[in-house]
Regions:
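Generic structural motif
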Residues: 1-3, 135
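Generic detector of contiguous secondary-structure segments
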Residues: 3-13, 93, 110-119
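Acetyl-CoA-dependent GNAT
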Residues: 4-81, 85-87, 98-100, 104, ...
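C-terminal "cap" of GNAT-fold acetyltransferases
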Residues: 42, 46, 111-125, 129-131, ...
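Conserved glycine-rich acetyl-CoA-binding loop
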Residues: 62, 85-99, 106-108, 119-126, ...
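Short, contiguous hydrophobic alpha-helices characteristic of membrane insertion segments
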Residues: 66-69, 128-132
Length: 156
């Protein structure tokens, strides 16, 4: 399996939206504020794909995962909506998608990946650390006084 670009030729927008919502569903009772994934609609998702670079993991015609990324000057590629269908998690699909983002960053002359993950999702912190990311900052969403997310970076 190799990541495929999510571009104008991509045609399975309903499945992509379902994938993201299913992948992010487990965190809803655990995080506050709610994930921005819940605000996605088909038009918003299509616009996000046009404005950013995105990849899909597809096997035997089934959409298994996705990743979105966009340059953040001066040197980072910001990673968002890394999602893998629940029954395929832990099988290397997320890592494969991150490798596509790493290749895109390198080809774009960017030297690091940056992401944000919720403070409560410590299992995600561990996975990203295993993949070479280090915590570089903490922050809070607008309207919150407590920490709600951590920033992690990976130098390429």
């Amino acid at each position: 399996m190799r990541p495929l670009p999510i571009d104008d030729a991509f045609g399975d927008w309903d499945a992509l939206l379902e994938l993201i919502l299913a992948s992010f569903a487990y965190m809803q009772p655990r995080i506050d504020p709610p994930s921005s994934a819940l605000l996605l609609t088909l038009p918003l998702l299509m616009e996000k794909a046009r404005a950013e670079t995105a990849y899909a993991a597809v096997e035997n015609g089934k959409l298994l995962g996705c990743i979105f990324c966009k340059p953040e000057p001066p040197d980072c590629l910001y990673i968002s909506k890394l999602a893998v269908v629940p029954d395929a998690q832990g099988k290397g699909i997320g890592r494969l998608l991150l490798q596509a983002a790493e290749a895109h960053a390198a080809a774009s002359g960017l030297s690091c990946l940056r992401l944000e993950t919720r403070i409560e999702l410590t299992e995600n912190h561990r996975i990203f650390a295993k993949w070479g990311f280090v915590q570089t900052a903490q922050g809070c969403h607008p309207g919150f006084t407590r920490l709600t997310f951590i920033e992690m970076r990976k130098t390429l």
